[in-house]
Amino acid sequence: TSARRLTSAAADARMGGAKLPAMSSAGSGNHGLTAILPIWAIKDFIDHDRDTLLRAIGLSHIITAYVKAHTGRLSAVCGCSVAAGAGATAGITYLVGGDVRQVEGAIGNILEDLAGVICDGAKAGCAIKLNTAAGAAVQAALFSLHGVNVKDTDGIIGNSTRKTIQNMGDLSHNGMGQADKTILKIMLEKQLNKGKR
């Protein structure tokens, strides 16, 4: 709950125009909030040292950038959910003491969970999506730490984390093309209709 509150409050403030700095990740401030703050919130509930915390945040940035490299900078898929969410769950799993297999399981869990979350532009409502991503990051990590992972027989999950992320990129580039056009059409129609009121 604290991860969700911290992350969504920061996004709400940022999208509301608060004049406060935010560290970006993969070129996005909201990605930065999602990649860092859930890990920061979790640290208060576990034993850890500063170096492990910093490595967890570093891992989150690396995974965020790696997923983003596959999904693309502009996509119909919400990068905060899938890219930064994957980074956050990897960082949380690492911080809590998870091994490589558990980090991979957590990434698969969150990508299966949030793969279909769309991006419909940067706005105040992003706080809700970041809330969801932060909660899902914690949940995916906890599931994996307890041996509960989505199998490669399910949906877009591949036989490796790399393949799962490649599948996510394929979904983003090839599967969501029409969704992207439809989202843009709806947003443009809203702008046109706003002037007619």
Predicted features and spans:
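Alpha-helical support elements that line or immediately flank enzyme active sites
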Residues: 32-48, 89-97
